[in-house]
UniProtKB/Swiss-Prot annotation:
Keyword Zinc applies: yes
Broadest EC class assigned to this enzyme: transferase
Subcellular compartments: Cytoplasm
Protein's name according to its UniProt entry: Thymidine kinase
Matching Pfam families: TK
Annotated source species: Haemophilus ducreyi (strain 35000HP / ATCC 700724)
Length: 198
């Protein structure tokens, strides 16, 4: 039975690596996958899903006006599809997440989405919000903070490596601009912990 899956985490948890491994597993069995990545994310080149461990795969770009249901139906005219995979799914719109539920429910094709849960302000991205609400299956991919605890949050850094607390929700960057941290270190690095004297 086809389902909509959302694999979410902070940065550097291996979301793209997991997507690429899943795509490889399908292809190894002679099955066709259709892989998308956000057009806005050009860190590793245009039209590629790239992992920090050095593997990559060509991908179709999605924009805020991409209609996934229409595009998948077009591809189905030429070949059978066994799975749709979306990297950087936090950049999806509410409408696009709904279209992906239609791909699952009407076309009976599983859709695997991989993305961040929250931004550097601990706020949900639009795509993540609706994937968390509408996905059939949710799975957190784990990464660790500098202290060894599970990292849930992302800190944005400026060019001097200092914590940034304001700004636009979306600013594309990698390890030079973002680090994943636990809640305690999120608060500490943002100066949000109270000074308690004993």
């Amino acid at each position: 039975m086809a389902k909509l899956y959302f694999y979410y985490s902070a940065m550097n948890a291996g979301k793209s690596t997991t997507l690429l491994q899943s795509s490889y597993n399908y292809q190894e069995r002679g099955m066709n996958t259709l892989v998308y990545t956000a057009a806005i994310d050009d860190r590793y080149g245009i039209g590629k899903v790239c992992s920090r461990i050095g593997i990559s795969q060509e991908a179709k770009l999605f924009y805020t006006d991409t209609n996934f249901l229409e595009q998948v139906e077009q591809v189905l005219k030429a070949k059978k599809l066994h799975c749709i995979m979306i990297d950087e799914a936090q950049f999806l719109t509410k409408k696009q997440v709904h279209q992906l539920t239609d791909v699952v429910d009407e076309l009976k094709i599983p859709v695997l989405c991989y993305g961040l849960r929250t931004d550097f302000q601990k706020e949900l991205f639009e795509g993540s919000q609706y994937l968390l609400a509408w996905a059939d299956e949710l799975q957190e991919l784990k990464t660790i903070c500098e202290c060894g605890k599970k990292a849930h949050f992302v800190i944005r850094l400026n060019e001097n490596g200092e914590t940034v607390t304001t700004g636009e929700q979306i600013q594309i960057g990698g390890n030079d601009k973002y680090i994943s941290v636990c809640r305690y270190h999120y608060k500490k690095k943002r100066g949000e912990l109270r000074q308690i004297t004993k």
